[in-house]
Curated annotation (Swiss-Prot):
It comes from Aliivibrio salmonicida (strain LFI1238) (Vibrio salmonicida (strain LFI1238)). Monomer. Keywords: Cytoplasm, Methyltransferase, rRNA processing, S-adenosyl-L-methionine, Transferase. It is found in: Cytoplasm. It is an enzyme of class 2 (transferase). This is Ribosomal RNA large subunit methyltransferase M. Gene3D superfamilies: 3.30.2300.20, 3.30.70.2810, Vaccinia Virus protein VP39. The active site is at K308. The keyword tRNA-binding does not apply. Its EC number is 2.1.1.186. It catalyses: cytidine(2498) in 23S rRNA + S-adenosyl-L-methionine = 2'-O-methylcytidine(2498) in 23S rRNA + S-adenosyl-L-homocysteine + H(+).
Length: 363
């Protein structure tokens, strides 16, 4: 196997390809990306047989910013007959060496309006294909996340890529996208960005301790309160920093203190803040440096913030801003865990999470 499929946001194929090329080169896996604008995916072509499996094991998925999912491609099928799409898939898989026994199957599409029209078909196709694969002992009799998951990605009717990913190094979400419902009482749709970030960056079994009731948080650029809403919903107390007006529904909870000051000038009087979150429309380098200052001063233990991207040179901007931030933290002797992701609910921005290492459980 020599191909790896990466899903990404439509319009960000170039950034995804650049990132994958860099990661592959670091691992001494040589090849090149194939991409078309606005298709929502990138195919990386390895020169050496077997390197696809090496890539999906050795690239750390949680360190990828622009890729939503990745899987090694076992076979590509086009012009599948409408009367029997299953047999060609079974025959193709049985002729490929090295395809592991899988514990689940996801029949997906790239995240574009055109491809998503196939999702209804994908849902209908899942049960019969799953049964056929189980009949051939290619899938376990019952779903399990202990072994690889099989992916079938339809990029157009009758044209799909079939492969697999490792459950300890992939996105656990269908199509790499958490399915979240907009809460009708939230003052802004931006609330979904912070909710998705919690799902992506914070393990679910740590929510009770790291997103705990009674914690204090600071929300820079808070108005009208989309991000504050997520914190209040988790029974936190929030310093909302913005010169604009906050939603009255949030103020009525008694959990929010509104400070009408510049987000770059606010300093918490008491150093009891766990979370600093920030979705200000500012130059990304300036926001990144501000978040670094909050952490090294001990004003917060975890930071979650957006970096707005320029129209051109987006990948280079991301690399530079994150490298500068790491250098600043390292120079000040700050130990941390950093992760960045272009989330589904992000647009021309990425979301960065930093956790002070003193706040990380050793278990």
């Amino acid at each position: 196997m020599k191909q790896v499929m990466f899903y990404c946001r439509s319009g960000f194929e170039k950034e995804c390809a650049g990132e994958i090329q860099d990661k592959a080169t670091q691992l001494e896996v040589f090849g090149f990306p194939r991409l078309k604008s606005n298709t929502g995916y990138v195919l990386f072509e390895c020169y050496q047989e077997g390197d696809a499996d090496k890539l999906i094991q050795q690239i750390k998925f949680n360190e990828l910013i622009f890729a939503r999912q990745m899987f090694a491609v076992a076979t590509e099928l086009s012009d599948l007959p409408t009367e029997d799409r299953i047999s060609p898939i079974l025959n193709a898989l049985s002729s490929v060496e090295g395809v592991p026994h899988c514990g689940d199957i996801r029949i997906e599409t790239p995240d574009t309006n055109e491809a998503k029209e196939l999702l209804k078909f994908c849902r209908k196709f899942t049960v019969p294909l799953r049964q056929a694969l189980r009949g051939k002992q290619m899938l376990t009799a019952r779903d399990t996340d202990r072994i690889p998951v099989m992916h079938v990605c339809f990029i157009e009717p009758g044209h799909c890529y079939v492969g697999y990913s490792y459950t300890n190094n992939n996105s656990k979400f269908f199509m790499g996208i958490p399915r979240l419902k907009f809460p009708s009482d939230s003052p802004s749709r931006s609330t979904l960005k912070l909710e998705e970030a919690f799902h992506v960056f914070i393990p679910r079994d740590e929510w009770d301790t790291r997103l705990a009731s009674g914690m204090w948080a600071v929300d820079l650029g808070a108005c009208p309160g989309g991000w504050t809403y997520q914190l209040v919903k988790r029974s936190m107390f929030v310093h909302a920093i913005d010169n604009g007006m906050m939603a009255q529904s949030l103020m009525d909870t008694g959990q929010v203190k509104h400070h009408m000051v510049d987000g770059f000038k606010f300093e918490p009087q008491r150093k009891n803040v766990t979370w600093i979150v920030c979705d200000m429309i500012e130059k990304p380098a300036r926001v990144a440096h501000l978040m670094g200052e909050w952490l090294i001063k001990g004003w917060a233990k975890e930071a979650l913030f957006n970096l707005k991207l320029p129209m051109k040179g987006r990948y280079d901007e991301v690399l530079q801003d994150i490298e500068n931030l790491k250098e600043f933290l390292n120079k000040n002797g700050f130990k941390y865990k950093l992760q960045a992701k272009h989330l589904y609910h992000d647009r021309e921005e990425i979301t960065v999470h930093i956790q002070a290492i003193t706040n990380i459980s050793p278990h």
